[in-house]
Amino acid sequence: MIDLLIIAGPTAVGKTDISIELAEKLNGEIISADSMQIYKYMDIGSAKITKDEMKGIPHHLIDVVKPHEEFNVSSFKVLAEKSIKDIWNRGKLPIIAGGTGLYINSLIYNYDFTDADRDEKYREYLTKLAEDKGKEYVHSLLKDIDEKSYEKLYPNDLKRVVRALEVYKITGKSISEYTKENEKKLYDIPYNVNYFVLNMNREVLYERINKRVDIMMGKGLIEEVKKLESMGYTPDMQSMKGIGYKEVLFYLNGDISLDEAIYLIKKGSRNYAKRQLTWFRKDKRSIWIDKDKYSSEEEIVDEIIKMVKDK
């Protein structure tokens, strides 16, 4: 079984430095789990690690696609699994470092992103049937094949009714049976996972976030966004909707002032950190590291290594 070390946490908590120190001490390589750092040319706004900051530690899944190219959790899972195997086969430890919770979960839970359990044509047929004969009629189709769902779901909950009918058509099983089987598969992964979440005092974290935004502005975030625009990348692209980029675009378009843009970037980043912490708290397998309780990052690194070895 492959050993997998995960260093997660909210934006600006200090995942980068700790993951690099761990990689140095544990002979590891780092796989980024950051939904913005996968984009080329978007360096300042994503707080992308520089070559110097890497300290010679190989980093994977950074600068993977151009800003107009599609990239999602399924894309991440495929590339990350390939990198994990490659790193492990070379006798090194794969270390996942990042704050995109869904990316991390795609690895530590056996999510299936294939379309094996989907039938778009049948779904369209049922939706059209609901328009022609009514939602109650489509709901009644469940009665003979999935009585539990028939009793549980309301006719107005068309999306879930259609999903239950679709699952039965493809698998011959009720949605509850199907879900139960999939839940068992969720934990069937080829990794021995050590999952750590870094945290710190909320006020201190927010101060760090605000300072990071000021640093980004000083490094030339506005110029970076201007360059991206000149390269043909537009506000409707997923990459350009990232925090920092969308606000600067509003400023460049004359919709808001520069001060307002900076305020919104800071606010958006703080709210994002709050959402990240909420996400990570849901996973009972994660071990939380309160950075405030340690006198140095080296102490944190040593504590993580001790916990990994004692497991």
From Swiss-Prot:
UniProt KW keywords: ATP-binding, Magnesium, Nucleotide-binding, Transferase, tRNA processing
Presence of keyword Transferase: yes
Gene Ontology biological process terms, A to Z: tRNA modification
Top-level class of the enzyme under EC nomenclature: transferase
Swiss-Prot/TrEMBL site (Interaction with substrate tRNA) positions: T100, R123
Record: residues binding ATP: G9, P10, T11, A12, V13, G14, K15, T16
Cofactor(s) for this UniProt protein: Mg(2+)
One GO MF term: tRNA dimethylallyltransferase activity
Reactions listed under catalytic activity: adenosine(37) in tRNA + dimethylallyl diphosphate = N(6)-dimethylallyladenosine(37) in tRNA + diphosphate
Pfam families tied to this protein: IPPT
Region (Interaction with substrate tRNA): 34-37
Residues binding substrate, per UniProt: T11, A12, V13, G14, K15, T16
Gene3D superfamilies according to UniProt: 1.10.20.140, P-loop containing nucleotide triphosphate hydrolases (3.40.50.300)
Annotated function: Catalyzes the transfer of a dimethylallyl group onto the adenine at position 37 in tRNAs that read codons beginning with uridine, leading to the formation of N6-(dimethylallyl)adenosine (i(6)A).
Family: Belongs to the IPP transferase family.
NCBIfam families, alphabetized: miaA
Protein name, per record: tRNA dimethylallyltransferase
Gene symbol of the encoding locus: miaA
